[in-house]
Amino acid sequence: MKFNRVWVFDLDNTLHNATPHIFPSINTAMNAYLQTHLGLDEAGAGDLRRHYWQRYGATLIGLMRNYATDPRHFLQATHDFPTLEKIVLREPGLRLTLRRLPGRKIVFSNA
């Protein structure tokens, strides 16, 4: 039996540096969501996000468990990037490196 190689890559902070643009946008949007939907001030939103990150590993999980937050609504409000191609920074040499890998390549992002 012949197996075809499949490479699966995470986009953010693996294939590109998400720190300068993507993550700050998500952080701002999540804080705004918590302020709007839970009536928190900015400090309270940040504190709750840190608490949920430490306890559940993600803000969304904490919101779902404690507030029955609809995950689709939360993600649409906090992870909307209409100009994504402008904020994903190219990594020099990455295209050539990926082309050298035999098989199918799949890129995903949990953001």
Where are these regions (language model features)?
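N-terminal helical cap/lid subdomain that shapes the substrate entry/recognition surface
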Residues: 2-9, 14-92, 100-103
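Substrate-recognition/cap helix-loop segment adjacent to the acidic, metal-dependent catalytic center
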Residues: 95-111
